[in-house]
Amino acid sequence: MIPRWLLLTLSLLLVWASHPAAAKGNEPNIVTHELDAPPADLFYFHGTNTILYRDRRSLTAHVSFDGGEEWETVKGNDGTIEGTVDLIWRHPFDDNRAYILGENGKHWITTDQAKSWRPFQVDVLPFASMRSFPLEFNGWDPKKVIFMGLDCTILGCLPQTFYTTDDFETVKPLREMTLQCMWAASRPQFALDIDMPKSTGDRILCVVPGLKGPFEHTRTERLIYSDSFFKDDAEGTEAKLDHGKPLSGVSLQIRSVSKYIVARLQSRGTQEQALYVSDDSNVWHRAEFGKHRIEEDAYTILESTNYSIQIDVQTTWQDNRMGSLFSSNSNGTYFTQNIEHTNEDLNGLVDFERVTGIHGITIVNTVKNWEEAKKSDSNKKKLISSISFDDGRTFQPLKADKDELHLHSMTTYAALHEMPLPDHRMFSSPAPGLVMGVGNTGGHLEDYSKGDLYVSDNAGLTWRRALKGPHRYEFGDQGGVITAVLDSSQTDKVQFSIDHGKEWESISLGQKIRPLFLVSTPDSTSLKFLLVGTSSDDTTKTLMFFIDFDGLHERECGSGDLEEWTARLNEKGEPDCLMGQKQFFQRRKANADCFIKKEFAISGPEFQLCKCSAEDFECDYNFVRSEDRKECVPAVPLTPPAGKCKDPSDKYMGPSGWRLIPGNACIREGGEDLEREIERSCSNVTGPPLITDGKPRAGKPQTISAKWTNYFYLERQASNNGVDETIMMLTDKYELHVSRDHGRNWKQIHPDEKFIEMVQHPYFSDTAFFLTDGKRVYYTINHGDSFHFFDAPSVPNKEYIRKLAFHEKFQDSLIWIGHKDCEGKNCRSQAYVTDKRGASWEPMLIGIADGGCNFGYQEGRNNSEKLVICEQYKDEEKNNNRQLVISDDYFSTMEVKFENIARSATKNGFEVVAWYEGDQKEYLNASVSVDGRTYANAHFPFNIKVPQYTVLPSSPHALFLLVMVNGGGERSFGSLVKSNSNGTYFVQSLEGLNVNDRGYTDYDELQGLEGVAIANVVSNREEVLNKGAAKKLRTMITHNDGGQWMLLAPPSKDVDGKNFDCSVTEGKGTEKCALHFHGYTERRDYRDTLYSGSAIGLMLALGNVGEHLTSASEADTYLTRDGGISWTQVKKGQYMWEFGAAGSVIVLVSDRKATKVVHYTLDEGMSWHEFQFAEKELVIDDISTVPSDTSKKFLLWGIDGGKRVIVTLDFSGIWSRDCNDDESDYYNWAPTHPFQEENCIFGHVEEYHRKKPAAECWNAWREPHIHSIGRNCTCTRADFECDYNYEIQTDGSCGLVPGLQPQDHVAQCSQDPDKVEYWEPTGYRRIPQTTCEGGLLLDQDVSKPCPNKEEEYQKKHGISGTGLFFAIVTPIAVAVAVGWYAYTHWDGKFGQIRLGDSGGSQSWLSRDSMLVAVPVALIAGIVAVAQSLPLLVKSLARSSSGLFGRRGMQRPYATRGSFAARRGDYSSVVDDEDELLGADDFDDEEDQA
C-alpha cells in the first residue's frame, strides 16, 4: 500500500508540472536592434514572417525574412535603391507584391515577397491626396495598377496618371488632367454575385475637371469612365449618377467600399452632399438618409460588409462632434439609423470597430451627456461604450462583472498618435473570440492614463481586468499567447499570458523604453512579436525588440485541447443566426498547456443554416423603412397593374416592399416569407396626376395682409436632398413667412418677433438670416425646414453698412457690424467675427466705414481663409479719412493698405479700391489686387479721367469698370473699360455707356454664354454734353467679352408678319435700323434678367426696331434662341417673363395691366398658348420662380383692389416624363460668333446638350450641360482686343490714342520672372479667354529678349550647325514664298489691321487689284532677302540650338484643360539684336499648359 503522504506529494508534483510553461524555466528568445529612426510604412507580407519598413532619415528600406530577428538593407540588383526610398507601398490584395517609390522617377516592384526587386520608370512625382493614393490597385488582377503623379515645372504642378497591366513591365499614360482615378474593380468583392463582362476588369473611373477646365471661377468636376484606358475616346463616358443623367459638382470624389463604389458629390452653393452608390459601376442610386443631411466633411464611411455600407453622419458642428450611425440595405441605397450620438473627433474619425472574423459584432462609443455637449464646447463629452451582436440592430453596454465598462477607441489613439498599423486592429484580431481594450468601469470613460487593460474571450459579451494601467497589446498563436507592454514613458518589461489573459508573466527588456508599437503577423498565428520604442534615456535612440515565444517549448496542441466556440448567442444563451446562418469556431481551450504552432494556417468558421426570419429581409427597391422600422413603405409613387384601380375603393395585389437580403443563406422552406405580394388599396396610390391633359393649373388667388412684400427663394442644388421649393417673405408689417411648396401654403415664423431685414447667404443657397430690431438673429441652414437663433454682440448698425458679411468657404464664419457707444453722441460702428455661426463672437475693429468688412477668402487664393478686408475711419473717428485695412488674425495685428479711399469692392476674384492722391478729390485712382494683399495701380487710358467708376459683372479673366464721363443726372453716361488678366491695365471697350441718376448702367452679362453681354450706349453724346439734349440710346452686343461690339440684328418681320418702319438689312443691325432694348436701369426688380442660366441660348427682352430706343410704352417683346445673334418678335406690348424646367416652358404675363391670362410656350417660342389663371382680372406686377429656372411652378404677384395677392401656376401636368439623355430628346448645340466661321468662340468649338423644341418632355438639367469642348480654332480678329493706349477706330481697327505712345511691353518680363521674350506693341492683345492657335496673330510682330534672358532667348530662337543649309536656302525661299503669299492672300490695307474676319473690304487696295498685288510681291521678296543676309552672319556666329526645336505637328485638343494661349507659333525676321528664323518651343509650352 502506498502511504497517503506519498500520494499527496505525487499529486502536488503533478499540479506543479502542469503549471504554465514559464514556470518550466524556459524564456522567450529576445533580440535587440538599434535603429537610426522609428520604422515607417512597416508591414508584414501576409502568410509569411517577412517584414518591410522604411527609414525616413536614411531613405533606405529594410527587410527581415524571419519575423524581425535579422535585418538587411534593400539595395536592389545594382544598389540604386539604397538612399532613394521615398515611400513603401504594399499591394492590399496580393501577398507577394510591394512597391518602393523612389526619387527622380525611378521605382521598384517585388513580386516574390521582397526576395528580389525590379526597377521601373515613371517620370513624375508620386502623388497622395485626400482623394487618392499614389498607387491604385485592381482587386481582380494584381498586375494592374494606376500610378498617380505630379508633373512639376517652375510654373507649378499638374496631375498626371499612368497605368500598367503587366506589373510595370510597361507603363502608359492614361489621360490628361485627372484629379482622381481608380479601377471599377478596386476590391476583390466588386460586383459580387453579378454577371459582369470581362472588359469590366479594365474599367477605370476618373474624376476630371469640367469641360470648361480646372481654372475657371465656376470650376466643376465630373466622373467619367473607360473600358479601354481612354484610347478610343479621350473624354470617356460620363457616369450617369442621377436617374440616368450625368452630374457635375464643385467637388466630386470616389472610393470603393467592400463590393460597392461610392461617389460623393457637392454642388456649388451648399454644404450638403449627395452620395451615389453602385455595385456594378453602370447603375447608380442616390443614398437616402431620411431627414438627415450629408454635409461637407460631415460623414465617415466605416468598415462595411458585403451586404451593407456603414456610415457615420455628423449631427453637430461645434468642437464637440457627434454623429449617428447608419447601415444601408444591400444595394447601398436606403440607410437606416442604428445608434445616435456616436463620438467623433475634428478629423472625422469615429469610435467604431467591427470584431474581426465574426459577423455582426460591433463596438462603438457614444456620448452620454449629448445634450450638454451640444450646447457648449466647454461641456466635456462623457463617453460610454456599447456593443451590438446583431449587425447594429440593437446595442447593449459592455460588462465587467456587474459594472459597465468603457473602452478607448479610434479618437483616443489618434489623439495619442498611436493608431494601429495597417492590417491590425484596436480591439480584436483573427484569434476567435478574443477582444482587448484599455478603459475603465464606472459612469463614463476616463482619461487614457487612468485606464486598465481588459480582456474578453467571448467576443465582448463579458470582460475582466487583465492588467492595471494602459497597455499596448497583441495576439499570437491564434490567441494562445497574448503580449502586453505598459504604455508609459518608462517601462522595461513585456508581459504575456497563455490562458486568455487570466494569468500573466513578465520578461525583462534590459532597458527602459517608451513603446511605439507592438505587432505580430496580421493573422495572429505566429509566436514571434516585434516591439518598437524609444529609449527612456535617449529619446533620439530607437530600439526594436524581436520576441520569439517558441522559446517556451510548449507542446503542439491536439484535438483534445480544442473547443467548439459559438460566435453569437441570443438573449436565451443559444447560438444566434445572422444572414441566415450560425457561426462556429474551433479554438484552443484557455487552460490548455500547448501552442497551436500552425503559422499562417487559420481554421475558418463553420456555418449552420437557419430558417428564414424577418431579420433576413430588407426593403426592396423604392421602399424604405417606416419610422417604427416594422414595415417597408413606398419611397416613390406606386403604379397599379393595368386595368386596376378604376375606382379609389378598388384593391389590387402588389409588392410587399420586402426582399431577401442578397447573399443571405437562410432556408426558405418552413421559414417566414415577407416577399409575398400583399393586397393594397387603390386609395393609397399616389403619384403624378391621373389626368395629364397638357394644361397648366392655377391655385386660387391668395390675399396677403400687406401693402408690399419682399421675398427670395432658397434654391436647392443638385446635391441637396428633397423636393421642396422654399420662399421666404417679409411684409411691411415686419412679419416673416415661409412657404415650402412654392407659395401654395404659408407659415408665419415667430409671430412675436419684429423682423426688419432678411439676408440671404450669397454662397450657400440653403441658408438665410433674419434680423430683428434687437440683438436676436434667426437663421435657417436647410431651406426653412427648421429655424434657430443666436444673439448678436450688439444691436444692428443704422448707417447703411451691411450688417452681415459671409465667408465663401466656411458657412459658419460671419462678420457682424453693429453699433457701439450709441448712448451718447459718439456712435460708431464695430465689427465682430464668429467661426461658430454666432455661438461666440470676437471683437475686431471700431469705426467701420460704409464699405464695411469682408472675408478675403476666394477659391484659389492661398492662405486666405482668415483674411479680412475692412474700410475704417482713421483713428476710429468719422470726420477722418477712410482707410483700407487688412488682417490675417482677426485684427490682433493689421496692415493699412490705403490711407485715403473713396470705396472698395470685390468682384470675380479682384479686390478693387478707389483712392485719392493727397487732398485732391476731383479724380480717383484705382488699385487692384488678385490675392487681397498685394495691390497694383490700375492704368486707365490716358484720354479717360476718372471722377467716379462702378465695378461691373465680369468674366473671371478680366475686370470691367464703368468710368463716368458725364455726371449730369439723367444725362449721365460713361466709358466701359476692360482690364488685362490681373486687373492692372485697362483699355476702352465701349464708349458712351448709358447711366441713370443713381449710378446704375445698362449692362447685362449673360450667364451661361461666356463672353456675351448687352449694353445700351448714348449715340448723341456731343448733343448731350454741349446742348443738354435728351439721350438717344442704342443697344449693342458683344460675343467676345467686349473685344468687339455690334448693333443687334432686327427680325425681318414682326409677329404679325408685317414690315417694320425702317429698312431691315437681313442678319445685321445698322445705324438706321436695328433692335434696341430697355436695359438694367429701367427694371423694378434687379433680379429680373434677360436670360436663364439653365436655358442655354434663350433670351427675352423688351424693345423696338428703329434708329434709337423709344419709350417703354411703345416696347414689344422679343426672343432669341441663338444667344443674341438673331431675334424674333413674339408678342406686341410689354410682358414679364420667367423660364421654367430649364427652358422647357416660358411664361409671359402682361406687365402691370389688368389681365387674367398668361401665355406660355413649350417649344422655345415657336408657338404660344394662352391659359386663364383667374376668374377676374388682376394687375400683375411680378412673376417669379426658382432662380435656376428649373421648376415647373411659378408665382404671380399682383394687386386686387389695393390688396396684395399671389397666384400659383403649376405646369407639371403637361408632360409626364423627363427627357431621356439621348438623341431622341436632345441635340448638340454650339454657340456661334457673327464674325467667325466654324462655330468658334474664344478660339474653340463648344457644344451643349439642348432639348429639342418638339420633344414632349421636361428638361431635367439644372445647368447647361456641356457636351464637349472640341478642337482649337485658328486665330482671327475676334480673338483680339485693343491694347493699352490704343482705341477702336471708326472703321473697327485699333489705333493709337492721339498724343500717346505705345506701352513698353518689356514690363511684362518683370511681371513674369520666367518669361524669356516679349513682343513689341502692335495695337492688339489677345483676349484672355481665347485658346486659338496660329492663324492671324495680331499681337505678334517683333520679338525681343527679356532683360538678362538673352542666352535663353538664343536657345529658343537660335540656329544650329545642322540647320546651316536651311538657313542659307531659307532667305531665298522666303522671298519667293512671301511674294506669292502676298499676291494670293493679301487682304488688307497698308499699316493697319482691320476689324472683322481676317479679310478686308473689296476695294482698289484689295488683293484683286493688280495695282497692289504685283508691287507687293516684288517688294516683299526683295526686302526679305536684303534683311536676311546680313543677319545671317550674326546668327551663325552665335547659334547653338536647333532651327526647328521640338515643334512637330500640332494636335487637336479634346479638353479645355489642355488648352493654352499659344504664343510664338510663328517667327519673323527681326531687328539686328534678335535671332533669325527663331523656332518657338512648342513642346515646352505644352508641358506647362
Swiss-Prot record:
Residues in compartment: Lumenal: 24-1362, 1432-1489
Family: Belongs to the VPS10-related sortilin family.
Cytoplasmic side: 1384-1410
Protein species of origin: Penicillium rubens (strain ATCC 28089 / DSM 1075 / NRRL 1951 / Wisconsin 54-1255) (Penicillium chrysogenum)
BNR repeats: 63-72, 387-396, 454-464, 495-505, 738-747, 1118-1128, 1160-1169
InterPro entries: Sortilin_C, Sortilin_N, VPS10, VPS10-sortilin, WD40/YVTN_repeat-like_dom_sf
Bilayer topology term: Multi-pass membrane protein
Name of the molecule in the record: Vacuolar protein sorting/targeting protein 10
Keyword Glycoprotein in record: yes
Keywords on record: Glycoprotein, Golgi apparatus, Membrane, Protein transport, Receptor, Repeat, Signal, Transmembrane, Transmembrane helix, Transport
Function, as annotated: Functions as a sorting receptor in the Golgi compartment required for the intracellular sorting and delivery of soluble vacuolar proteins, like carboxypeptidase Y (CPY) and proteinase A. Executes multiple rounds of sorting by cycling between the late Golgi and a prevacuolar endosome-like compartment.
One Gene Ontology cellular component: Golgi apparatus
Annotated GO biological process: Golgi to endosome transport; Golgi to vacuole transport; protein targeting to vacuole
Gene: vps10
Pfam family, one: Sortilin-Vps10
Glycosylation sites: 306, 331, 684, 862, 925, 982, 1272
Stretches that traverse the bilayer: 1363-1383, 1411-1431
Location(s), subcellular: Golgi apparatus, trans-Golgi network membrane; Prevacuolar compartment membrane
Signal peptide range in chain numbering: 1-23
